[in-house]
A protein has these predicted regions:
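N-terminal amphipathic/basic-hydrophobic helices that include classical n-h-c signal peptides
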Residues: 1-18
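ABC family nucleotide-binding domain
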Residues: 22-236
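Intrinsically disordered, low-complexity regions
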Residues: 16, 128, 253-257
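Conserved beta-strand-loop-alpha-helix hinge in the C-terminal portion
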Residues: 240-264
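Short coil/turn linker and secondary-structure boundary residues
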Residues: 3, 94, 136, 248-251
């Protein structure tokens, strides 16, 4: 099935004069699944919005609805009812192929397990999202990939394969890949889950730097200390939001990193 580009453009342009500047606008979102003869209600009327430039952490234990919400935010799943506007586009109205196009254009994904192609260089891994964008030439693709790797301080690792990089460096490549398509938001799923404390702080310091540059970041984690590096925390339980609050005392990951003992100590 060919993506109807004209329809996607039309949906984005629809009612432009009424558009808000919210990156994410979710209202009364519900998601139900059939498991055997039972109906499982994973999300039970969730509502929240995220403004440009926010750094939001989403937390919740197993069964809270966190994974379902993550899949919805990433346009990997559609709600049973309610609305999800991503950069003013109503996700529920899009076909599967249109959702894939929207994902590629609007969202930069960062995963816990990096999801890098093993036999592909850092540069080539970062270029991958741009291969699906026919408007980007090979020269522009190369330029953007270099700039993204420079932004995560890996300019000297362009030709390295994943197995030639540390875990922290692999995650930096994944972050560069998330940045390369100039998305409206970065969606990170447990991005420090496989890293030690020092490397976790290095990655969170990078996310804080990107946020200071104006990047909108949604960071899913189960670690309360990681949430303190963001400006806002949303907590889910049993399909409901039980907490949505600004973080009054945001920790600096750079300062926390500087306070760690050196390897020789």
């Amino acid at each position: 099935m060919v993506v109807d580009k004209a329809r996607v453009v039309a949906l984005i342009a629809l009612n432009k004069d009424k558009m808000s500047n919210k990156i994410v606008d979710i209202q009364e979102l519900r998601r139900e699944f059939k498991m055997g003869g039972e109906i499982v209600k994973a999300l039970k009327g969730v509502s929240f919005a995220i403004e440009p430039g926010e750094f939001v952490t989403i937390m919740g234990s197993s069964g809270s609805g966190k994974t379902t919400l993550l899949n919805t935010l990433g346009c990997l799943d559609k709600p049973t009812s309610g609305t999800y506007l991503l950069d003013n586009v109503d996700v529920k109205k899009l076909s599967r192929n249109e959702l894939a196009k929207l994902r590629n254009q609007k969202i930069g994904f960062v995963f816990q397990s990096y999801n890098l192609l093993a036999r592909t260089s850092a540069m080539e891994n970062v270029e991958l999202p741009l291969l699906y964008n026919s408007a980007v030439s090979a020269g522009e693709r190369h330029k953007r990939a270099v700039e993204a790797l420079e932004a995560v301080k890996l300019k000297d690792r362009l030709d390295h394969l994943p197995n030639q990089l540390s875990g922290g460096q692999q995650q930096r490549v994944a972050i560069a890949r998330a940045l390369v398509n100039q998305p409206v938001m970065i969606l990170a799923d447990e991005a420090t889950g496989n890293l030690d404390t020092r490397t976790s702080y290095e990655i969170m310091s990078l996310f804080q730097e990107l946020n200071k540059e104006g990047k909108t970041i949604i960071f899913v984690t189960h670690e309360p200390d990681i949430a303190t590096f963001s400006s806002r925390t949303i907590v889910l339980k049993d399909g409901h939001i039980i907490k949505d609050s600004k973080n009054e005392n945001i920790r600096s990951a750079k300062e926390m990193l500087a306070g760690l003992p050196t390897k020789d100590e």
